[in-house]
A protein has these predicted regions:
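Residue-level recognition of pore/gate-forming positions within transmembrane alpha-helices
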Residues: 16-19, 43-47, 111-112, 135-138, ...
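Hydrophobic transmembrane alpha-helices of multi-pass small-molecule transport proteins
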Residues: 50, 109, 117, 127-150, ...
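Membrane-interface helix-cap regions at the ends of transmembrane helices
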Residues: 21, 25-28, 32, 46-68, ...
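Hydrophobic alpha-helical transmembrane segments of multi-pass membrane transport proteins
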Residues: 13-21, 25, 53, 74-97, ...
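Loop-to-transmembrane alpha-helix entry segments
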Residues: 64-74, 104-107, 123-144, 157-163, ...
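Juxtamembrane helix-loop-helix junctions in multi-pass membrane proteins
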Residues: 17-48, 99-101, 176-199, 249
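Cytoplasmic-side transmembrane-helix entry/capping segments in multi-pass membrane proteins
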Residues: 12, 69-78, 126-139, 187-197, ...
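Hydrophobic/aromatic residues within transmembrane alpha-helices
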Residues: 29, 38, 42, 94, ...
């Protein structure tokens, strides 16, 4: 297992700050857009920004000529699904029916999911008692800071139970997405990040249009929230996420979710 560097810790803190604002950005975007449309717009904007940067910097996307290339594209596709399309859509929809506190605590579950996944799938992160104890203490600390009542607040929405499940499934997707990124063969961080976002947008587009239709021109606050989501918690955050996972591992990266609810 790679020991995290100071640069890794700085990147982790920055990622936590950026992702922490994503719930507010989503709340603003949902004023005018449906949850699937918000997910599509943030991923599409982020993919366009990173594609321009990738091309301008001369970085190349992997081809399809070798088994390794095809394996890389498989991981990129899974990244688009597990790290972008599915969790963004589920969290956006869930936020319509659950308290923000519950959504935040759900993200704090991710490290507890990644630890056993890393142990059994990657074989490089041993699930020693010290780590288990540390991750559990971190989770309990988040609940105490936010307030245990946030877990049982009933908003009165008939779809709230399903929304809670959606938030939990989103957390599981983030955990699996981290493992998937770690398993990917060596590839440019920009190419991997950009490719995952492009595929995520392609997969989201028909679903969002079929379910929610063509969106109307939004209110200014919703537009600002959507642009913020695309540029920072998606474009910039994806680069940081992939970089941290590749250099320090998914278990270390998952600790960012202890910052997000705060």
């Amino acid at each position: 297992m790679t020991k995290p560097t100071i640069a890794n810790w700085i990147a982790l803190i920055c990622l936590g700050i950026i992702w922490g604002g994503s719930f507010m950005g989503a709340k603003l975007a949902l004023i005018s857009f449906g949850p699937m449309t918000v997910a599509l717009l943030r991923v599409s904007l982020a993919s366009m920004v990173l594609l321009i940067i990738t091309i301008a910097s001369g970085r190349k996307f992997p081809k399809f000529s070798t088994p390794t290339d095809r394996r890389i594209w498989l991981h990129i596709t899974l990244m688009g699904l597990l790290t972008n399309s599915i969790p963004f859509s589920l969290l956006n929809w869930g936020q319509l029916y659950v308290s923000s506190g519950f959504a935040g605590v759900t993200m704090a579950v991710v490290p507890l999911l990644v630890l056993p996944l890393s142990h059994f799938i990657l074989k490089s992160n041993e699930m020693v008692p010290r780590k288990i104890f540390g991750f559990i203490i971190g989770f309990i600390g988040i609940i105490v800071l936010i307030g245990p009542t946030q877990l049982i607040i009933d908003t009165g929405a008939s779809l709230e139970p399903l929304a809670r499940i959606a938030c939990i499934v989103a957390a599981l997707c983030y955990g699996l997405g981290s493992i998937n990124t770690r398993l990917c063969p060596p590839v440019s961080i920009m190419a991997y990040s950009t490719g995952g976002l492009i595929i995520g947008a392609i997969l989201l587009a028909p679903v969002a249009l079929f379910i929610e239709g063509i969106p109307q021109w939004p209110e200014t606050t919703a537009l600002v929230g959507t642009i913020y989501l695309g540029l920072f918690p998606t474009a910039l955050a994806t680069i940081l996420l992939v970089s941290i996972i590749n250099s320090a591992g998914p278990a270390f990266m998952s600790m960012v979710n202890y910052q997000v609810p705060l």
